Amino acid sequence: VSFSERGKEKLTNKTKKPMPVWAMIITDVVLTAAAIGVFMLFDYVMPQSSGVKGEVIATVDSSAEGSFTLPNAADSSQAESTAQDDGEPAVTTTAPQTEKATTTLRTEQTNRKNWGNQDTADYRSDQNAISSITNGAITSEELGSASTDNAQVTVYKKSIGEGSNKITYFVADVYVTSASEIKSAFADGEFGKNIKDSVFSMAVENKALFAINGDFYGNSERSIVIRNGIKYRDDADVCVLFTDGTMQTYSPSEYDSDAVIAKGAWQAWNFGPALLDGSGNVLETFNTTKYLNSANPRSAIGCVSAGHYIFVTVDGRNEGYSKGATLSELAAIMSDEGCMSAFNLDGGKSAMMYFNNTIVNAPDGGGRDLS
């Protein structure tokens, strides 16, 4: 198709109408939303490998292997699960404890901020809640035990209270011959962001005898991350397992990365807060938020002595079965289990315990994938 010169001139001189203001505003909003959407998808959804290989900061000396003795050392060579002779789990009810958990005042710190859970403050422990655990009757059911040459695990299902106050929790009593038997795993074996997998899958892939969720390090870009003697990150409130089998918790102002690494940090978890003072006493204050201090599903790690550890998962948000535990109740449970030090791990839908090729607890909402 051809146009005359006059027609071309008319088309050339034709003035374009400007876009209405309202249309310009809508266009800008749509483009901005699209840009934010792409950023959100990339930054918060798409798996991203950090590319960080980590720095080896500790190894367990071969001479230290087997330095701790398993309770059933004579039978430890048989890697098999055990149950009651009649095939039914034992169910026992313990009377109220004669020795009550006490509280201790932690070092006073002003303007503390736990970067794993921002905008935290010091919340006083609840003496009534602590007493309800230490003076209550606990029903205990052994779910089974399993052992290898280097580890022994016995898992219990326990409950305390009734009706809307009932708490149901699971306790793994773990003995190892060396700290090297306590291992951590990344989702897909990769340190990064938005890389997630189920506790079950990670346990199976790593051939774990027992597993529990950790601190969900991928939820925060600022925290300490030490896995199997390799440091990936180090800037927050932390619980450290050392190569000698001892465990210690640190608040932000107490934590000295260089000193901890020099001591031989084997594993480190960031979430918190610390629950006990290192002598088995419930802390007088918890560095946390109001929401995290309320009754929720929980996971925690505790140390009785070098080579002897307690892992606890508390179910919650299911009235009549388990309401969940406050930090005071969780601390009292860890103290009641004989722990000297203990640390709160990621909870809520993350709280899951794996044993004998199954998730033994009832995770809130079916649980969620973790990093």
Task: Give residue ranges: language-model regions.
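Active-site-adjacent helix-turn-beta-strand microarchitecture at beta-sheet edges
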Residues: Y217-L292
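Short Gly/charged-rich anion-binding patches and loops
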Residues: D197-S198, N270, E329
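Short, solvent-exposed aromatic-acidic interface loops
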Residues: A187-G192, E254-D256, V314-E319
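General beta-strand structural signal in soluble alpha/beta enzymes
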Residues: F210-G214, L241, T249, S341-G347
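Conserved, well-ordered active-site substructure
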Residues: S220-L241, F286-M340, S350-S371
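A short, polar/proline- and glycine-enriched secondary-structure boundary/capping micro-motif
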Residues: G192-K196, D258-A265, G320-L327
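Zymogen propeptides
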Residues: S2-D235
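Sec/Tat-exported extracytoplasmic proteins
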Residues: A203-N206, D215, S279, M334, ...
